[in-house]
Amino acid sequence: MRILKSHPLLRLANSYIIDSPQPSNISYLWNFGSLLAFCLVIQIITGVTLAMHYNPSVLEAFNSVEHIMRDVNNGWLIRYLHANTASAFFFIVYLHMGRGLYYGSYRAPRTLVWTLGVIIFILMIVTAFLGYVLPYGQMSLWGATVITNLMSAIPWIGQDIVEFLWGGFSVNNATLNRFFALHFVLPFVLAALALMHLIALHDSAGSGNPLGVSGNFDRLPFAPYFIFKDLITIFLFILGLSIFVFFAPNILGDSENYVVANPMQTPPAIVPEWYLLPFYAILRSIPNKLLGVIAMFAAIVILLVMPFTDLGRSRGIQFRPLSKIAYYFFIANFLILMKLGAKHVESPFIEFGQISTVLYFSHFVIIVPLVSLIENTLVDLHLHNTLSLKNVF
């Protein structure tokens, strides 16, 4: 074990994954980080393998994907692993963010960790969108056309930006080439950002815990206790992912994407992948194109205001009943937005979308600070009454 403490590289690994002291009371909700790292490794390995057989051209992109599925040894497995792990990646990220919101992981001294996490999330969305375009089925082509066209909402220079992104006057070879190049390189940028996320956590105060208090009173080394704990969820994740990959590989996809891209025929409904539906619903709920685009981006960036709008005195909401109610309303509203994103743009879905959008933004800028102030006032009143009773007796 001495070499782990003396060798410069091994000493670094030792401080992060062997001797790193963790609060003894952290639950399985703190296992999402290791699961996300595992997902990223799967995505990079399967993605690089798929890139060896993919041809980023308008004429051959769809055929090269079919070639991977039919002719490459275990190509179907690699592709389905890549597609379904992408969904699992976002699902676990949403759970990870939900846990962060519940337990106040955004509060000082972990504000930098939260900020880096939001940047990682934005980059994940960009990477997922670029990858969705590559198979060049109907949904790929029209999804790329619709989403890149959002840039045209920018006054004066919008259309020029769209044509710059396309490399022409419509989605063409240049578009697929640049999307492929970016989709290939961004996961490595994600890996670097994930490392920065980990360093920021390590150098601030380490992991939080379910009580929201300092974990310095009782800590355990990462190995073997938390390595074993992480392995349990990793093996459960492999089991769950295998069920999707082997028994229902296309359940989260769109059948329209098995039709070769046709610029002359628009699909009945242009719908993104399920994990982007809430933001798509926010985009569509605002009639003005520019305001819709701003709202969609703001829906992600607004996560950065949480360290400033949460005025509660305790970290997390586990002991704050009013904040708990607001939190669960927010989760329900987010799921409603996800459902509305898959619906046609017609009444009553438009009206429901507008109500849900207002509630979504209200949670961050109105509900959280207001509920925090009410709870602080109730605590102060209770303390005042307690002190008054003590003085009486």
Swiss-Prot record:
SUPFAM superfamilies: a domain/subunit of cytochrome bc1 complex (Ubiquinol-cytochrome c reductase), Transmembrane di-heme cytochromes. Binds 2 heme b groups non-covalently. Fungal cytochrome b-c1 complex contains 10 subunits; 3 respiratory subunits, 2 core proteins and 5 low-molecular weight proteins. Cytochrome b-c1 complex is a homodimer. Its cofactor is heme b. This is Cytochrome b. Its main location: mitochondrion. It comes from Venturia inaequalis (Apple scab fungus). The keyword Cell division does not apply. One of its GO terms (cellular component) is mitochondrial inner membrane. GO terms for biological process: mitochondrial electron transport, ubiquinol to cytochrome c. Heme b b566 binds at H96, H197. The keyword Iron applies. Gene3D superfamilies: Cytochrome Bc1 Complex, Chain C. The lineage of its organism: Eukaryota, Fungi, Dikarya, Ascomycota, Pezizomycotina. PROSITE patterns: CYTB_CTER (PS51003), CYTB_NTER (PS51002). A ubiquinone binds at H202. It is a multi-pass membrane protein. The chain crosses the membrane at residues 32-52, 76-98, 113-133, 179-199, 226-246, 290-310, 322-342, 349-369. Component of the ubiquinol-cytochrome c reductase complex (complex III or cytochrome b-c1 complex) that is part of the mitochondrial respiratory chain. The b-c1 complex mediates electron transfer from ubiquinol to cytochrome c. Contributes to the generation of a proton gradient across the mitochondrial membrane that is then used for ATP synthesis. Heme 1 (or BL or b562) is low-potential and absorbs at about 562 nm, and heme 2 (or BH or b566) is high-potential and absorbs at about 566 nm. Keywords: Electron transport, Heme, Iron, Membrane, Metal-binding, Mitochondrion, Mitochondrion inner membrane, Respiratory chain, Transmembrane, Transmembrane helix, Transport, Ubiquinone. One of its GO terms (molecular function) is metal ion binding. Heme b b562 binds at H82, H183. It is found in: Mitochondrion inner membrane.
